[in-house]
Amino acid sequence: MSEERNTRKVYQGRVVSDKMNKTITVAVDTYLTHDVYGKRVKYTKKFKAHDENNAAKQGDIVQIMETRPLSATKHFRLVKIVEEAVIL
């Protein structure tokens, strides 16, 4: 009996907080077109993600994937760091 795994959501966003141990907060921007006016509206949603090695820093662009619940608010894990933040 072969069981197929469900497709998991993968998001790309910016790390807005890395103050917690092994946890990052990622802001994901989504653009939707308004039904009546046709204007693109930007929505931002924040997700907490598991970062096992504390590799991601604030300002990094990261990719996160849906996973089993790791805590009350953490349902994503870090897949990879797409772009590191530039420190001026």
Curated annotation (Swiss-Prot):
PROSITE patterns: RIBOSOMAL_S17. Pfam families: Ribosomal_S17. InterPro entries: NA-bd_OB-fold (IPR012340), Ribosomal_uS17 (IPR000266), Ribosomal_uS17_bact/chlr (IPR019984), Ribosomal_uS17_CS (IPR019979). GO terms for cellular component: cytosolic small ribosomal subunit. CDD domains: Ribosomal_uS17. Keywords: Ribonucleoprotein, Ribosomal protein, RNA-binding, rRNA-binding. GO terms for molecular function: rRNA binding; structural constituent of ribosome. GO terms for biological process: translation. Signal peptide: none annotated. One of the primary rRNA binding proteins, it binds specifically to the 5'-end of 16S ribosomal RNA. Belongs to the universal ribosomal protein uS17 family. Part of the 30S ribosomal subunit. This is Small ribosomal subunit protein uS17. It comes from Leuconostoc mesenteroides subsp. mesenteroides (strain ATCC 8293 / DSM 20343 / BCRC 11652 / CCM 1803 / JCM 6124 / NCDO 523 / NBRC 100496 / NCIMB 8023 / NCTC 12954 / NRRL B-1118 / 37Y).
